[in-house]
């Protein structure tokens, strides 16, 4: 009997995968340790956050998330692995394919650089892993990206400077956002 595991089941990509395929097990950051040592036949790891602006705002915290992802994968010890990554690991994705090497990383933002580091660690630990580099996404359940921002009037997060500017002009803005642990102001209820 085949056993497959989805990590990142509550995120955009993971949630869509879960909606289309019945995995033997699915988990996310709060319950991933229950999967340690299970050695599934296949692990689809979609558990890396895709909030580019947060990664670039705090590169070290984002790299710590990549280290934790590597450790999670090692502890799960799957026989086969699919890592969901990002095309942002390429400085210039024009004409590139998923297996295109990331040659020039100079000037690459932390988001891409840190995901590239995770890809390299995965290659060290699981040489036969399939790494899928997704482009900008759009669809049901998306909570961020350029296209989402175009049709969503109220932003889910504000930088501190923008919050201060808007809150000074509007009591509604002042009461609608709360300072989050990541230093951004988050829209209440999101």
Regions found by a protein language model. Give the residues of each.
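Conserved glycine-rich Rossmann-like NAD(P)H-binding loop of the short-chain dehydrogenase/reductase
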Residues: 22-33, 38
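NAD(P)H-binding glycine-rich loop region in Rossmannoid oxidoreductase-like domains
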Residues: 33-78, 87-96
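N-terminal Rossmann NAD(P)H-binding glycine-rich loop of SDR-like oxidoreductase domains
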Residues: 2-23
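Short, well-ordered alpha-helices that flank and scaffold nucleotide-derived cofactor binding pockets
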Residues: 19-23, 71-74, 120-124, 152
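NAD(P)-dependent short-chain dehydrogenase/reductase
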Residues: 124-190
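Active-site beta-alpha turn of Rossmann-fold NAD(P)-dependent dehydrogenases/reductases
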Residues: 47, 82-86, 133-135
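Short glycine/proline- and charge-enriched loop/turn segments
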Residues: 96-105
């Amino acid at each position: 009997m085949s056993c497959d595991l989805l990590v990142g089941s509550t995120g955009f990509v993971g949630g869509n995968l879960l909606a289309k395929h019945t995995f033997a097990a699915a988990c996310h950051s709060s319950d991933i340790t229950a999967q340690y040592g299970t050695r599934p036949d296949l692990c689809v790891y979609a558990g890396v956050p895709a909030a580019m602006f947060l990664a670039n705002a705090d590169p070290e915290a984002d790299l710590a998330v990549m280290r934790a992802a590597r450790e999670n994968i090692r502890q799960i010890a799957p026989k086969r692995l699919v890592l969901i990554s990002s095309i942002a690991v390429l400085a210039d994705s024009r004409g590139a394919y998923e297996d295109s090497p990331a040659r020039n990383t100079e000037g690459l933002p932390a988001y891409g650089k840190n995901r590239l580091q995770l890809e390299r660690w995965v290659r060290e630990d699981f040489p036969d892993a399939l790494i899928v580099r997704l482009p900008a996404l759009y669809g049901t359940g998306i909570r961020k990206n350029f296209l989402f921002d175009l049709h969503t009037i109220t932003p889910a997060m504000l930088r501190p400077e923008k919050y201060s500017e808007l809150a000074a002009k509007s009591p509604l803005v002042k009461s609608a956002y709360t300072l989050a642990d990541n230093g951004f102001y988050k829209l209440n209820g999101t």
